[in-house]
Design a protein with these regions (language model features):
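Conserved short acidic donor-positioning loop in nucleotide-sugar-dependent glycosyltransferases
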Residues: 25, 42-43, 95
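Short, well-formed alpha-helical segments that are part of the catalytic scaffolds
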Residues: 14-27
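Membrane-interface aromatic/basic loop that binds lipid-linked glycans or pyrophosphate carriers
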Residues: 275-337
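A conserved acidic beta->alpha catalytic loop
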Residues: 41-51, 69-71
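Donor-binding/catalytic cores of nucleotide-activated saccharide
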Residues: 74-78, 95-232
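Glycine-rich, basic loop-to-helix element that forms the pyrophosphate-binding segment
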Residues: 67-85
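Short aromatic/hydrophobic "clamp" motif used to bind/position activated sugar donors
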Residues: 90
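Short beta-strand/loop segment that forms part of the nucleotide-sugar
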Residues: 33-43, 65-67
Length: 337
């Protein structure tokens, strides 16, 4: 057996849905014998250990790794997965998502044929069983885009381009640039991809291909992190965004649309998270210079234009002073909470 792609899957309390993810890899048209599947468990307390042990006994190309302490985010498991990957190429999968049947073949053929550092594609958002094609700046680009540098089209650094699991990476490239996921934060995938995209050459975008199924859990105690608006996650998002802004400053880079999109996402968390207003104000002050240069013309392709304008005006008003920040936050909270 000589696998060509290492697929890295961090797991945590995923007993009820992990096998959907695993089976989507096993059933790839690429041939499972061409895949090394690495499952890293972040000290789960459900019955997932038995599932992982059964898988590693059944398949010689499945590696299982168990962390003795919970790390609190997918970062450490993913980093360990990369350290243990033996293949030329690396892909990622979240434990509650799935690959489309030809995903690995499509990505492998593209990265081989075009000798890229990164290939990225589109994904389906699935909410309560309904498949949705997420709209983004990519809708306005050709079906196939090849860049020698992201500087050729920096607007492609949209938040949808920064997802970790709709891509294939050349492992030697990741090792060369020292790309790692930061611990203890969210936006960890954005930070990782920002380093990768600023250094990659070439990069290919498959804008007409939807290869990844992103299952968004919106109900109950088992919500997706992106839907779980609690103070602990707000703090992690703040830390993650701070890392991203610091990285851009250290590299003397400024990507207006990307930074504005990130601020919109963070502002959503400020509005929807039930937390101490003093904490929110402190976070706002820390990012005030970024709010000041927020582009009023930021276009969020996945929402209607009128709502987009409303959001942009709100953020510009917030940036004027502490008073307007509190006022807009209060009004938005009444509307959306």
């Amino acid at each position: 057996m000589n696998p060509k792609i290492s697929v890295i899957v961090p797991t945590y309390n995923a007993e009820s849905y992990l096998m959907n993810a695993v089976n989507s890899v096993i059933n790839q048209s690429f041939g499972f014998e061409n895949i090394e599947l690495i499952l890293i468990d972040d000290n789960s307390n459900d019955g997932i250990m038995d599932i992982l042990n059964d898988l590693s006994r059944k398949y010689e190309n499945i590696k299982t790794i168990f962390l003795e302490e919970n790390s609190g985010s997918p970062s450490k498991p993913r980093n360990i997965g990369m350290d243990n990957a033996s293949c030329e190429y690396v892909m990622f999968l979240d434990n509650d998502d799935e690959y489309v049947e030809d995903f690995c073949k499509k990505m492998y053929d593209t990265i081989e044929n075009h000798q890229c550092d990164i290939v990225t594609c589109r994904n389906y958002d699935v909410v309560k069983g309904e498949y949705q094609k997420y709209h983004s700046v990519l809708d306005k680009r050709p079906d196939f885009v090849k860049l020698n540098s992201i500087e050729e089209d920096p607007d492609l650094l949209s938040t949808t381009s920064m997802l970790i699991w709709n891509k294939i990476y050349k492992k030697s490239f990741l090792l060369e640039i020292g790309a790692k996921f930061p611990s203890g934060t969210l936006y960890e995938d954005v930070y990782f991809n920002l380093i990768a995209f600023m250094n990659a050459s070439p990069i290919v975008y498959l804008n007409d291909y939807f290869g990844y199924i992103y299952n968004i859990r919106v109900d109950g105690d088992d919500k997706s992190t992106s839907q779980d608006f609690k103070e602990e996650n707000l703090i992690k998002f703040y830390n993650g965004l701070n890392n991203i802004f610091n990285l851009l400053e250290s590299e003397n880079k400024h990507y207006s649309n990307f930074e504005s999109e990130m601020l919109v996402g963070f502002t959503k968390w400020l509005v929807l998270t039930k937390s101490d207003d003093k904490l929110k104000l402190r976070f706002f002050k820390d990012f005030k210079k970024h709010y000041k240069r927020f582009s009023l013309f930021t276009r969020l392709e996945h929402i209607p234009l009128v709502f987009n304008i409303f959001i942009n005006l709100g953020i510009k008003l917030m940036s004027l002073s502490d008073f307007t920040f509190k006022l807009v936050l209060k009004i938005a909270g009444l509307i959306f909470n």
